[in-house]
């Protein structure tokens, strides 16, 4: 099961919803759950914003995908961290961030204990050239947003779902949208907590047999 949380502190997530969470579940946190994180201080043990989340991931045996505003020196990144059973696998920074944030040049995917996870941060899902990791195959595709529901991002997620044959889950601050492997919006849920079932699918669309060539013709006149 995929549990999504927004507009709630992490301690309250544990207190109010902890009994519902089982090993192998996946938790998605939007940016306001942890807010601004000083990454050097966090990794150096001087702050503990992420420590509780990492320990909870290990104790529960779950994957946690948490959005944040990551601070490194004077630079601020719009980021998402993937934590698998107590291990921070990495951090994805938005490639195309708004003014005031530093953009990244690397699109990351994560080989977790539940399979390959592809993560898109905010508007990055609207750029097809950033889909390469997902198109190469993955089990889960998540798009974590720091805004309310966005029609353009949902439309792009529907196209990505069709292209990959996988479910795509878009989490916004006010809602979550689960899109099936054929690009249909299967469910939209509102509120600070929502739960989705994302079945493993192998829908890849129709396949043309034989070798295909692509030609570009020019006007000779």
Language-model features: where?
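Cys-nucleophile CN-hydrolase/nitrilase-fold catalytic domain and related Cys-dependent amidase chemistry
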Residues: 9-85, 149-166
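C-terminal beta-strand edge segments of enzyme domains
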Residues: 102, 109-114, 173-221
């Amino acid at each position: 099961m995929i549990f999504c949380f927004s507009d709630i502190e992490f301690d309250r997530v544990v207190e109010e919803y902890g009994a519902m969470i089982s090993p192998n579940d996946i938790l998605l946190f939007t940016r306001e759950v942890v807010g601004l994180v000083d990454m050097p201080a966090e990794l150096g043990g001087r702050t503990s914003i992420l420590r509780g989340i990492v320990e909870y991931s290990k104790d529960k045996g779950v994957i946690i995908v948490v959005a944040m505003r990551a601070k490194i020196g004077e630079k601020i990144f719009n980021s998402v961290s993937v934590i698998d059973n107590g291990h921070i696998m990495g951090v994805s920074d938005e490639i195309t961030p708004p003014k005031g944030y530093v953009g990244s040049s690397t699109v990351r995917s994560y080989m977790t204990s539940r399979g390959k996870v592809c993560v898109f941060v905010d508007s990055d899902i609207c750029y097809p050239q950033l889909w390469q990791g997902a198109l190469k195959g993955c089990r889960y595709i998540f798009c974590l947003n720091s805004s309310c529901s966005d029609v353009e991002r949902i439309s792009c997620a529907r196209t990505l779902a069709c292209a990959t044959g996988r479910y795509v889950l878009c989490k916004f601050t006010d809602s979550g949208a689960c899109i099936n492997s054929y690009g249909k919006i299967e469910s939209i849920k509102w509120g600070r907590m929502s739960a989705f079932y994302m079945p493993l699918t192998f829908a890849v669309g129709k396949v043309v047999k034989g070798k295909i060539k692509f030609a570009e013709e020019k006007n000779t006149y």
